[in-house]
Amino acid sequence: MTRPRGPAPRDGAAWRRDPARRVLLRDAVRGREGGLRLACAVMAGLIVSGGVACAQDSHMAVAGAPATAVAPPGQPAPMPPATVADAAHLAHAAAVLELLLDQGYYWLGQHNLGKAHETIQRALSIEPDNNEALFLQGRLQMAEGGTTQATRTLERLERQGAPAGLVAQLKAQIQAGPVDPRALAEARALAASGRMMPAMFKYKALFRNGDPPPDLALEYYRVLGATILGYQEARTRLAAWVARNPRDIDARLCLDRILTYRVTSRAEGLDGLRALARSNVSAQIRSDAVAAWRDALLWEPITGQSIPLYDEWLAQHPDDTEFTIRLKKAQETQAGVDAANDRQQGYALLSRHMLDAAAREFHRAVDIDPHDPDALGGLGLVAQARQQPALARQYFLQAMQAGPDAAGHWRAALKALETGGGGVDPLVARIVQAINAGRYDAARADLATLGRRPGYGLTVLSLQAALARRQGDTADAVRLYREVVRRAPRDAGALFSLGALDVQVGDATEAADILTRLQRLAPAMARRLEAMMLSAQADRAGDDDGRIALLRRAQALDPDDPWVRLKLAHALDDAGDHAAAQAMMDALTAPRNASAQALQAGIIYAMGRHDTATAGALLERMPRTGRTPDMDRLASLVVLDQRIAALNHAPVAGNAAVLALADQPDPTGERGMRIAAALLARHAPQDARQALARGESLTQPPTPARMLAYAGTYLRLRSAFDTTRCLDAFDAMAKARPADVTADQARARQQVAIGLAIMTADGFDRYGRTAQAAQVLAPVLRAHPDSVEAHLAMGRVYQTRNMATRALEEDETALRLKPANIYALAAAARDAGGAHHLAQAKGYATRLAHEDPDGPMSWEVRSDIERIEGNSRGQLADVEHARHAQCTLDGEGECGGHESFVSDYRWPLIDSEYMDLHGATLPASYHYIPEDDGAQAMDRQIVYLRDSVSPQFDANTFVRSRTGVAGLGQLTEFAVPITATLPFESWDHRLSFSVTPTLLFTGDPLTNAVSAHQFGTVAVNGARPWGYHHYYTQGVGLSLNYVNRWFAADVGSSPLGFPITNVVGGLEFAPRLTRNLGLRISGGRRMVTDSELSYAGERDPGTGKLWGGVTRLFGHGALEWSARGWNAYAGGGFAYLGGTNVIGNTETEAGAGGSATVWQDHDRQWLRVGLDLMYFGYKRNAYFFTWGQGGYFSPRQYFGAMVPVEWSGHNRRWTWFLRGEAGYQYYHSNAAPYFPTSAQLQGQADGSPPSYYGDSGASGLAGNMRGRLVYQLDHRLRIGLEGGYSRAGSWSETSGMWMAHYTLDGQ
């Protein structure tokens, strides 16, 4: 890169532009730049102006110098020799400095830091304070990683008052910081190996999808311009760069080189390269321009169009042997083209009986090639028409001698001449013209007239066959051509036409026989027919390599057939070789005299690549004679694409403006398909459907092409009904006229049908109906065992069935069919990970990265592997890379951060349970929504992952009220748990700390004689005066919780401040035995919170002693099965319960149950129904409040069967949960003594009964209800409310809770 120059320089760079002006403004020059700058300016002024300014000021005189004579007016004053010598020396120094600065810019642009350092140091040795040299030094320091040194250099420039442009550029580079050297080396290695597309994505990731730093800009644009996706961006940005910096020669060179990459701009690029090669710039720039000039010429086709370019090159490089050979070949090719053009024009003129003009064209052809049999024969026909039989005979004989292969044709003409036959029949010529122009009724009328003439029977048959073929009546055309061949077995033209039709209808046997006959009669026609047969075989090839090989053979046989080239280009695109495909089509359309068919094929290819600019340029080159109805249709599509592109430019028009384009008939379906695709790109599927509906209503009757095109578009819209409808309509029309269906249409219909089956199967699979999905795919795989997509779809079915190994087998089958298929590689990597073959998964991911480096799918697969390994932070980074890559592919540029604020993307874990000492938290949960497109799904995942790895806080206000006798079983709890959670690499590995202020309220048991008798030791000791009060307590509970995937542990204490405090905690192991089956084993010590006595402990009003504070020491095990749509569990456990001055007790429990989703709405609402069976039993009944009892529900037996019904859902900011449970319960509690831990107290109580609690029990209905509603206030804060009611055993309970969750997500 050469150095930029601002419009108004303040330093010495300016005098290089206008030295004479600087001499006159010497005061402006003198100053901080020093004497060298002044002297250099003076000398440069002398050189440019040719004279010396007369110094009038005394301070300009040199002290001690001899006086000089005053020059006459108008004459420059002579200078002393010493002054002249000094000035010359200083001018030389200025020139050296100029050269060194230019070289410094160049070597920095080339990233040759060693040479750049040497050059810049030499410049600074000449002028240490030179602003540009210091600017270059700062850039070099940044390139070497010396940010601190570069900052000091920047400060020095600011102190010197350097130009603002230099300061701003260096400041921007310092702020951008050094780039990752490893990633930069990888990007450069990719570019050096010619893999420009992967290199482009690597550079974009390196620059975070932003602008490149100045020292890497040209390097990046070179790579960007060599890619299909980045060419236009590189061209636009480089053009703007050069416009801002017109003297940046390196950028000019880069732009000109990139312009030569496309045929439409190659001439402009060549002009620029030639100018640079001949200009007075540095030798390296000239050398690079010459090399780029030569490379561009190598891309030019070897045709007559390139002859002037070759001549110009060889005039300066006469020893270039390769271009000498190319020039000779181009001249030969052009001679052949000119001869062919003259010959064709001659025959056209002959058909209109313009004999003189026809003779001139034939003579031109013969001048080029004296042995051209067709031109010689044409001259014979002209002579015959002029009634010159001797001359006609001479030309026919010469034609027979010049072309033995076509001798039979001219022999027949000679025979007709000798027997007195006439020339070209005007009626035949008129019929041919009418058929070619599409005037079929006129052609039929003239055919009827011709058929009445004697001796024209064979001609009429041939013309009828041509008419039938042109109208698409293939069966009748085959019948007619067979009759022509039967009557004239050596008619090469009829044989060729019949063979071409056989290829079209798939009659390979007859086509092969005709090929054999043509090889003897007309080898050139035989080669064309063989090329058609190979092209048809390519249509049926099962793999890209085989298809490409067949098409290359076809192209070698018939290199001038544009349609074979178009097929080959499409095959190369399918195989991923886009550069070769583009080069092939450029070579086809580059010649100035490219045929109309070649231009048409180029337009079709360009439109398929969404290259509207190239399509429009080729359309402008189309001659009027080539503007067939097909070309007019293509032209309308080009205009449509241009209008859509204009509507998508800022300011972007609304969807209605795009939909309004569907305002005219659409017989081929391409118009509606393009409009629908544009609306789909805007995420407007309903508008896309409306566009297709308009196309159908405006085009009646339907055509096969349109119905097939619409079927494919409806498939993209995931509309199975409309896809099936369009396919059925296409099949009905194809059945009525089977010959009308081309091989391409048949293949497209097959692919749409396969896609429809896969979409149907995926729909079943999504909701767990894998049996139906497999039934849909099985016949597809039998009929199309080479369908990669079908194998991948079956793999997804197996994956849903948790048969990861079988899924991987299907993926590997697909990979055997197409080893480089990125979708198969992605599926194999995911399924290998699902089978826990992580090494294999990473191997497939590596292969995918090789095929699609930095593509969205590569990053998504990496994120899946990170997920399997439990690394959500790595997964988040990978998904963000995937999202940015997708934005780049979609042309959106840098992705915005708005997705973080989409309320629908945040779904809290709505059914989290309230846990003592911890509360109920509202962490993020992830939900897959089938309606999401790829970008939305990634945004949703990014939001979830950001939240799940961010520190977060939860706070609750919890109130619970339990029924019972005041002062005994009655309890009101008020708790405010506050929990801080710190995730590590994922939410499954986290640490939480909770603080829970808690207040418990119960009544005064002593206010009632019955309740007083059942409390503490009052029954035998009475109550002391201080005992008469409402019993309440308060404290603060603490808890530390650790989770690491399938392991969890917690430790804490019951609220500090309660009468009795206990250390509590637990462990849980929950490994997955299979994908569906899990084992859960837990144990620990927990509080029993049935009453204030069991929860906090109380003081006996009779003795003043404490009792209560019960804890449960438990162990529990369960097996849990979870599958899509349903789950089940079964387990049991044992516990020991004890407390302060409380009788010990044991519990056994068991339970089983499950639930299933019975209804869901668009994956946003669910209704689940289940069944829960439970049993528990205690050794003792301790649900009393006298001394030694525990105050907790403890029946001898409890059986319950409950049917839960649960409705949950999410809508924008709202998430809810409502669960109701009802069923049958039976329980029985044993009798118990008043004082189970003291025989003495019990003995005293026996003296004043009652001293025993009787047994009790009940059966009947039980149930509970709980509901929760959560609202997302913003991307960090959500709040919620919960209410619940339970009735079980002999008690009921009501609860309510307010909830808040705050995430420190850094957004």
UniProtKB/Swiss-Prot annotation:
Pfam families: BCSC_C, TPR_16, TPR_19
This protein's pathway: Glycan metabolism; bacterial cellulose biosynthesis
GO biological process, one term: UDP-alpha-D-glucose metabolic process
Signal sequence bounds: 1-55
Membrane topology: Peripheral membrane protein
UniProt repeat feature TPR, residue ranges: 97-130, 270-303, 339-372, 374-406, 458-491, 493-525, 528-561, 754-787, 788-821
Domain of life of the organism encoding this protein: Bacteria
Tagged with keyword Repeat: yes
Matches recorded under InterPro entries: BCSC_C, Cell_synth_C, CellSynth/LPSAsmb/PSIAsmb, TPR-like_helical_dom_sf, TPR_rpt
Protein's cellular compartments: Cell outer membrane
UniProt entry keywords in alphabetical sequence: Cell outer membrane, Cellulose biosynthesis, Membrane, Repeat, Signal, TPR repeat
Signal in keyword set: yes
GO cellular component, one term: cell outer membrane
PANTHER family: LIPOPOLYSACCHARIDE ASSEMBLY PROTEIN B, TPR REPEAT-CONTAINING PROTEIN PA4667
Function summary: Required for maximal bacterial cellulose synthesis.
Family as reported in the entry's similarity comment: Belongs to the AcsC/BcsC family.
Protein name according to UniProt: Cellulose synthase 2 operon protein C
Originating organism: Komagataeibacter xylinus (Gluconacetobacter xylinus)
